[in-house]
Design a protein with these regions (language model features):
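Short, well-structured alpha-helical segments in soluble
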Residues: 107-121, 228-244
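N-terminal helix-turn-helix DNA-binding module of bacterial transcription factors
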Residues: 1-58, 354-356
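Periplasmic-binding protein-like
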Residues: 120-128, 182-188, 219, 241-253, ...
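Flexible loop/turn connectors
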Residues: 234-356
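Alpha-helical structural signal in soluble globular domains
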Residues: 42, 85-89, 137, 196-208, ...
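Hinge/beta->alpha junction and helix N-cap segments in small-molecule ligand-binding domains
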Residues: 68-81, 99-107, 160-170, 186-234, ...
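Alpha-helical recognition/docking segments in bacterial nutrient-uptake
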Residues: 2, 59-173
Length: 356
């Protein structure tokens, strides 16, 4: 059936005008909630909603709930860029995007309910909100809701998140493939997502039949800052004999990697000639002190786009099965990791040509 005939059929059965039905199916803002509901129900009953709504977002107002720091680029550049990706994904649609700051845990439930029960709120995206009570309330309200980089432990809400465990495993596996065996992981374990990365790193150790010893292979940072990691690595170098130093550092974030590199350089160690450094993320710092970082990129910019697409599908098929979309990371090989050849010493790193 052609689009024109579909619109005419829906208009006939709902008693609405052709122009109203067309505006609803196009996701236009100048339609009432009552009209939108009638058109959606009729289109669904006729079995034409999915075909007609492809590429459209059948709502006019969306709220993004996120920790307060997510709205400040200097406080949390990762979440800030995720929000930008949500904005970009919504550009083709006439959707009013609003924001509400919530704590990750122990969030203000009354504030959340007030925003969710606002007649202008048709759907929500929850970015990095771990509070299980908020997840319960989101289910009770019943409006379409998608989680980003967090999870509903009761498995009721759809989610989009990086595959943190696989990302951690992939990063560690690359270092092993480059010949490294003594790898020190510098991680902040403040959130369960970082624990998942550590679990993946342990998986890589196990795949190599190596024993992971936290006293030798893990430095736990208090935060994700460059200053904290620099101090941590500096103290480690002061307390560790030169013969016992690792061949590589696997660092769990951009700014942490910057701090780690600075700590190594302050101690007179070169990257990667003396110690290799690999990062997870590395979107924000392409080069640190002229050292282009090898890294596994977390799929930051894809999170917003995929969340909007998932929300679109929930609007079309609200009774569809609920699940979590795990996004893979991407390995970006640059110059901060050297290859170690077993039994032949390290592969030399030369920045000058043979005849320079």
């Amino acid at each position: 059936m052609s689009k024109k005939l579909q619109v005419a059929r829906i208009a006939e059965q709902t008693g609405l005008s052709l122009s109203t039905v067309s505006r609803v199916l196009a996701g236009k803002a100048n339609t009432s909630e009552k009209a939108r509901r009638r058109v959606r129900e009729c289109a669904k009953a006729l079995g034409v909603l999915e075909d007609m709504a492809a590429g459209r977002l059948l709502l006019n107002s969306l709220v993004v709930f996120a920790p307060r720091r997510a709205f400040d680029e200097r406080s949390d550049i990762f979440y800030y860029r995720v929000i930008q990706s949500i904005n970009k994904a919504l550009e083709p649609h006439e959707v009013r995007l609003r924001y509400c700051a919530l704590e990750e845990n122990d969030a203000d439930a009354n504030l959340f309910l007030a925003r969710m029960n606002d007649p202008q709120t048709e759907a929500a995206l929850l970015l990095g909100i771990d509070d299980p009570h908020i997840h319960d309330l989101a289910c009770d309200v019943g409006k379409p809701c998608v989680l980003i980089n967090c999870r509903d432990r009761k498995m009721r809400l759809p989610a989009v998140t990086p595959d943190h465990r696989a990302i951690g495993e992939n990063a560690a596996r690359y270092l092993f493939e480059m010949g490294h065996r003594e790898v020190l992981n510098v991680l902040c374990l403040r959130r369960y997502t970082m624990e998942l990365r550590l679990a993946g790193i342990r998986d890589a150790w196990e795949a190599q039949n190596l024993a992971f010893d936290e006293t030798r292979h893990l430095l736990t940072a208090p935060d994700f800052s460059a200053r904290g990691s620099e101090a941590l690595v500096t103290r480690f170098l002061e307390e560790t004999p030169a013969a016992a130093l690792p061949g590589a550092l696997l660092v769990g974030g951009d700014f942490m990697a910057a701090g780690a590199v600075k700590g190594l350089q302050n101690a007179g160690l070169r990257v990667p000639q003396d110690i290799s450094v690999m990062s997870i993320d590395a979107f924000n710092l392409a080069a640190i002190e002229d050292v282009p970082l090898t890294a596994v990129h977390v799929p930051r910019d894809a999170l917003g786009e995929e969340a909007v697409l998932m929300l679109q599908q929930r609007l079309i098929r609200p009774q569809a099965a609920v699940g979590t979309l795990l996004l893979n990371g991407t390995l970006d090989v640059r110059e901060s990791v050297r290859r170690v050849r077993p039994g032949r010493g390290s592969a030399s790193v030369q920045r000058d040509g043979l005849y320079d």
